Amino acid sequence: MACLLPAAQTLPAGFLFLVLWASVLGDKLLVVPQDGSHWLSMKEIVEHLSERGHDIMVLVPEVNLLLGESKYYRRKIFSVTYSLEELQTRFRTFGNNHFLPGASLMGPLREYRNNMIVVDMFFSNCQSLLKDSATLSFLRENKFDALFTDPAMPCGVILAEYLNLPSVYLFRGFPCSLEHMLGQSPSPVSYVPRFYTKFSDHMTFPQRLANFIVNILENYLYYCLYSKYEIIASDLLKRDVSLPSLHQNSLWLLRYDFVFEYPRPVMPNMIFLGGINCKKKGKLTQEFEAYVNASGEHGIVVFSLGSMVSEIPEKKAMEIAEALGRIPQTVLWRYTGTRPSNLAKNTILVKWLPQNDLLGHPKTRAFITHSGSHGIYEGICNGVPMVMMPLFGDQMDNAKRMETRGAGVTLNVLEMTADDLENALKTVINNKSYKENIMRLSSLHKDRPIEPLDLAVFWVEYVMRHKGAPHLRPAAHDLTWYQYHSLDVIGFLLAIVLTVVFIVFKCCAYGCRKCFGGKGRVKKSHKSKTH
């Protein structure tokens, strides 16, 4: 140790700490991500783990959107059957289909078919990976300590079982209430609204009835989405597999915060990381700083419908542009489509914007969003009231939650007019209650003992240190469906009650025959003698 002292005197203490910390840790983590926006939060955790000295390998399809090279991790590339053009076309079609005429009329059926455009491609991706013997052999030889994945598309779940690795899931939500169904978390239909319903946790009788029916249909939806994965998992593992059985020894990192979500029962292996994507406000570039400064006392409005929507129909884009031109604020609109011909001087189109940094600026008055969870949490973190235009997935439910809390106004983007958008913007900007409500949510959200990113890193390291977290696993996983609902106990007790009732009935019947049956026969014989 003494030989290190001269060198140590010339190095910053922080650097020495990192070096020593890396030598203590250095576990090997295999990451199986989902491409697209799901990767953004996972990437933050991966980079932080890498900075703490862990050896990170990310399993990446050769054709992808966001899974690029990084100094924080190594990539293992595997081949897929689709091209970059097909990948981009599928995502673009998925986003733009929500603006088709009548998109809201078919409701769940159209949404399901539209989702399958992307889901089928992810399944093809998984199929290619699990049939790639060279990649599987490489992964076996590397002897990782844990696997980190997004279980929305369960390829990583299957791989964890194949490699016999403890797993950590990062998840936000998916149809079928996947995390609660597979995590054996109680989910009462009386006050826990189901996915796509747009209900709050205070439901009317008709809403509870609809919620009950949707809960039953979720099992069918689960089968439609995931039955194919059970086939390829059974083929790989050489035994019959049901996906629920593969989720038993896992830790769930859920991007939830009950400031935003409705309160509900949870399990001890569920850790909450809502707002993990929120960062401290950074300094704006010269370009955006100039836009903000030029807005004057009226300030700015930030407008983004996310990366999935690249083009809006011309008529709808012009309606939006007309509404934006009627407010005194400067509008920064992230939009890559054709420029509306009626775009007003106060509206600036940009292909990209530093959303969190702009939302954190004191001159920001409102946020027009598609209600994706990343954007919603950034709005909460920075205390900006919202005008929400949900398009697909959990966005309708997200918008309902914020509307219920009085922090925003929801519009149907397909049916709204320029007047509707103008009125919504003026409402959230001029009505002080919206700003007060979102600031209250922001204060509650930030009042926590540890930052979500640090909490996520702790639990991933926890699983690597202890080779899993089986002590947090609920025993519900070991029960059959009838044992879980105590139907065998109810049946046994019911049988006892029925047996006792039957015996009592028989005894009473026997007693009645003894008491009254004999007298009847005596009277009858007496009458016969008198005749």
Swiss-Prot record:
EC number: 2.4.1.17
Pfam families, per database record: UDPGT (PF00201)
Induction / repression: By dioxin.
Organs and tissues of expression: Expressed in liver, kidney and at very low levels in colon.
Signal sequence segment: 1-26
Predominant location category: other
Protein name (Swiss-Prot/TrEMBL): UDP-glucuronosyltransferase 1A6
Name of encoding gene: Ugt1a6
